[in-house]
């Protein structure tokens, strides 16, 4: 089955074969005329497969003859009105052997089934032959040849003037058969058919080869309606709420008013960043319907699926990474796809957004926030005084607005990546990263480190080469040169108690986390006053990496010094427990609960001891 559409192969020949009661299997009509003979196709060598035994009838038959592929759907109709109590016919299509005929096969099957019904209803095909030899006229013949005068002896009297009722010449026989055929048509109550099989074959051949569809009327109520569709590989059934659809075409340009309403409502939110769950929420659509729409888009190669981009993800190179070196087109596509636009400011964001108020002298900020230097006092002495709680909140708000502005610009630039496989950007005053650089970056990914750790170690390389890390990861996943290691939470004592006996989750202050946040805040403030080495604050990392998020709630919580965990509802508790029993990934659990990974881990700690399995 095709993985992508390559076009329809033209039909070489189409012919109509029928079983003649006295001559056997024969070709009645073909188009183009004499095309079989001109190309050395001998019908007698395979006629037993065209009009086969009853066991092979009403089945699609495909076989090879020389350099040709023959596809047909033989039909046999049993009825006492026919000369041999049956009528067999077949519409046969001939193609070049080295081609894909699967798009034609459903149409050929439907064509045979349709004419089977038409023949059963009004003898459409048999009457079009204009030959009474196809019908059983024995009864009529016997009734005609019966003497009109009854008597004990059946021997004709030579002296009698009675005219014999049996035909005396070949002409009389032909006239009698024609008369009986007309009587048969009259007895059946059916009009004479003006249907032409030869004309039908010609129009099917020309229309399918030229337009891949045909609409040929047969009578007032029937028509041959065929449209050829490409048969592509069916989409995966493993489409989940946490998957992120990436459009490979501009969906807004191909959208049609006749599309499904759900499909039209979700198209504006397919930007390469939103998960299916978020698309469902933003479009106010049922998640099940959204998944079905995404599967349709996947089938027609308009959308591919990716994971939610998170710095807590773990990626590693696959065995197909060698294709990056052997396929020059892949490398060149990667070079142009993974680079930032020249005006992008996303690289100015710090690695840890919870870091202090923006020390200009800090190494972790100097290369990322040059554009922000004007908003920070240039005199170090002016920052030697301790900050009050109010000034911290004010400075965090300023930092929040800066982050939001940069992230908004970055998100708008990222949505363009889902409209084309190759990112077309402004090439003025910009150099593409080398292929060896990109290969080394892909090769350096490993299962032993999160994406955040990898990004911190490769930050300067990514910045100097103007590489967008999200595009970099997305391209590797699409080309299958890297793969992701998924994380599954597993409760250690999950099998020892029933779900209803699990410890209820209560509202609780995260004392340890608050202390950790207060410690970070204190260190950052000391760093801002110049009394603490900035390298110490830069080395602080959370115990567990969480998914990347540019929300400012974390920074605001630093100012208050406390954070609380809201209690899960009964429905959310059931979702969490069921997800654990079903061995769902952290991504899906976070999406189902609409909570970040750090909070989900805290809820899991309340349920009991658990471990994380990476696979």
From Swiss-Prot:
Gene expressing this chain: NPR2
Biased composition (Low complexity): 143-167, 373-398
Protein's name in the database: Nitrogen permease regulator 2
Disordered as annotated region, ranges: 143-176, 354-398, 527-551
Induction field: By urea and proline.
Residue numbers of Phosphoserine PTMs: 362
GO biological process: cellular response to amino acid starvation; cellular response to nitrogen starvation; negative regulation of TORC1 signaling; positive regulation of autophagy; proline transport; protein transport; regulation of autophagosome assembly; regulation of TORC1 signaling
Biological function: Component of the SEA complex which coats the vacuolar membrane and is involved in intracellular trafficking, autophagy, response to nitrogen starvation, and amino acid biogenesis. Mediates inactivation of the TORC1 complex in response to amino acid starvation. Post-transcriptional regulator of nitrogen permeases. May be involved in putative NPR1-dependent phosphorylation of nitrogen permeases or in the processing and targeting of nitrogen permeases at the level of the endoplasmic reticulum.
Disulfide bonds: none
Membrane topology designation: Peripheral membrane protein
Keyword Membrane tagged: yes
Similarity comment text for this entry: Belongs to the NPR2 family.
GO cellular component: GATOR1 complex; Seh1-associated complex; vacuolar membrane
Further details from the record: Present with 319 molecules/cell in log phase SD medium.
Listed Polar residues bias regions: 527-539
Top-level taxonomic group: Eukaryota
Subcellular locations according to the entry: Vacuole membrane
Consequence of gene loss (knockout): TORC1 abnormally activated in presence of rapamycin.
Taxonomic placement: Eukaryota, Fungi, Dikarya, Ascomycota, Saccharomycotina
């Amino acid at each position: 089955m095709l993985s992508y559409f390559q076009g329809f192969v033209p039909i070489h020949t189409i012919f109509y074969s029928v079983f003649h009661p006295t001559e056997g299997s024969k070709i009645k009509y073909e188009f183009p005329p004499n095309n079989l003979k001109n190309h050395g196709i001998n019908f007698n060598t395979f006629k037993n497969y065209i009009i086969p035994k009853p066991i092979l009838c009403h089945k699609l038959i495909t076989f090879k003859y020389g350099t040709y592929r023959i596809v047909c759907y033989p039909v046999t109709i049993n009825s006492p009105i026919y000369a041999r109590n049956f009528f067999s016919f077949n519409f046969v299509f001939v193609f070049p052997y080295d081609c894909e005929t699967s798009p034609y096969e459903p149409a050929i099957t439907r064509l045979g089934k349709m004419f089977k019904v038409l023949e059963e209803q009004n003898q459409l095909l048999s009457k079009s032959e204009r030959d009474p030899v196809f019908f059983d006229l024995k009864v009529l013949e016997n009734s005609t040849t019966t003497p009109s005068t009854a008597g004990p002896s059946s021997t004709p009297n030579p002296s009698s003037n009675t005219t014999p009722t049996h035909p005396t010449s070949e002409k009389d026989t032909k006239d009698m058969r024609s008369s009986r055929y007309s009587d048969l048509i009259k007895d059946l109550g059916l009009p004479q058919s003006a249907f032409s099989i030869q004309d039908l074959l010609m129009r099917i051949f020309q229309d399918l080869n030229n337009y891949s569809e045909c609409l040929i009327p047969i009578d007032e109520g029937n028509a041959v309606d065929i449209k050829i569709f490409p048969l592509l590989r069916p989409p995966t059934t493993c489409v989940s709420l946490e998957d992120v659809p990436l459009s490979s075409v501009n969906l807004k340009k191909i959208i049609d008013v006749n599309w499904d309403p759900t499909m039209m409502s979700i198209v504006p939110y397919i930007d390469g960043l939103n998960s299916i769950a978020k698309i469902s929420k933003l479009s106010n659509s049922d998640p099940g319907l959204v998944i079905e729409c995404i599967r349709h888009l996947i089938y027609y190669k308009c959308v591919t699926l990716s994971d939610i981009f998170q710095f807590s993800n773990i990626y590693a190179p696959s065995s197909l990474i060698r294709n990056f070196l052997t396929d020059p087109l892949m490398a060149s596509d990667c070079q142009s796809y993974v680079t930032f636009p020249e005006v992008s400011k996303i690289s100015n964001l710090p690695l840890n957004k919870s870091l202090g108020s923006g020390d200009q002298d800090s190494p972790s900020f100097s290369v990322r926030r040059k554009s922000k230097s004007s908003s920070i006092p240039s005199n170090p002495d002016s920052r030697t005084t301790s900050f009050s709680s109010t000034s911290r909140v004010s400075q965090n708000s300023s930092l929040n607005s800066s982050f939001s502005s940069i992230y908004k610009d970055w998100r708008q630039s990222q949505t363009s990546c889902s409209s084309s496989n190759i990112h077309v950007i402004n090439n003025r005053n910009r150099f593409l990263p080398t292929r060896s650089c990109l290969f080394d970056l892909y090769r350096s990914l490993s299962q032993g480190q999160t994406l955040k750790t990898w990004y911190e170690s490769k930050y300067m390389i990514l910045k100097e080469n103007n590489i967008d890390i999200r595009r970099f990861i997305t391209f590797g996943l699409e080309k299958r040169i890297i793969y992701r290691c998924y994380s599954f939470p597993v409760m250690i004592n999950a099998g020892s108690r029933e779900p209803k006996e699990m410890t209820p989750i209560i509202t609780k202050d995260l004392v340890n986390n608050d202390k950790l946040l207060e410690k970070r805040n204190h260190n950052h403030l000391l760093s801002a006053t110049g009394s603490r080495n900035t390298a110490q604050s830069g080395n602080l990392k959370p115990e567990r990496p969480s998914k990347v998020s540019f929300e400012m709630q974390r920074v605001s919580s630093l100012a208050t010094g406390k954070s609380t965990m809201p209690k899960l509802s009964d429905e959310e508790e059931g979702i969490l427990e069921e997800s654990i029993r079903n061995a769902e990934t952290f991504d899906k659990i976070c999406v189902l609960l609409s909570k970040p990974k750090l909070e989900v881990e805290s809820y899991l700690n309340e349920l009991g001891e658990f471990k994380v399995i990476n696979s």
